[in-house]
UniProtKB/Swiss-Prot annotation:
One GO CC term on file: ribosome
Similarity annotation: Belongs to the universal ribosomal protein uL23 family.
The protein's assembly and partners: Part of the 50S ribosomal subunit. Contacts protein L29, and trigger factor when it is bound to the ribosome.
Transcription regulation is among the record's keywords: no
Name this protein carries in UniProt: Large ribosomal subunit protein uL23
UniProt cross-references to PANTHER family, sorted A to Z: 60S RIBOSOMAL PROTEIN L23A
Keywords, comma-separated and alphabetical: Ribonucleoprotein, Ribosomal protein, RNA-binding, rRNA-binding
Length: 102
């Protein structure tokens, strides 16, 4: 892969920050940020993507594969997609503040 296509891939790895009550508690207690990432993303890719996009130093990455829920509409059953969540630990002194839009 060329350097350009690698950088394009890294920009597509992070889908969205996961801002929930649980993610906020984890961020306050363990200094970890939760992100929704592509299902085929690896830990090194997630680390490189966070460092590239947010200009911070990453200490570690923990990944959780979340199974999609079974939902029902009348008689028919459907299923939501499986997705992947990444908890990213930042090195001391580093911070990402989503409320400020940084």
């Amino acid at each position: 892969m060329s350097a350009l296509s690698t950088q394009e891939r890294l920009l597509q790895v992070i889908l969205a920050p996961q801002i929930t009550e649980k993610a906020t508690r984890v961020a306050d207690k363990y200094q970890q940020i939760a992100f929704r990432v592509r299902t085929d993303a690896t830990k090194p890719e997630i680390k490189a993507a966070v460092e590239l996009v947010f200009k911070v130093e990453v200490d570690s990455v923990t990944v959780v594969n979340v199974g999609g829920k079974v939902k029902r509409a009348g008689r028919t059953f459907g299923r939501r997609k499986d997705w992947k969540k990444a908890y990213v630990s930042l090195k001391p002194g580093q911070e990402i503040n989503f409320a400020a839009g940084e």
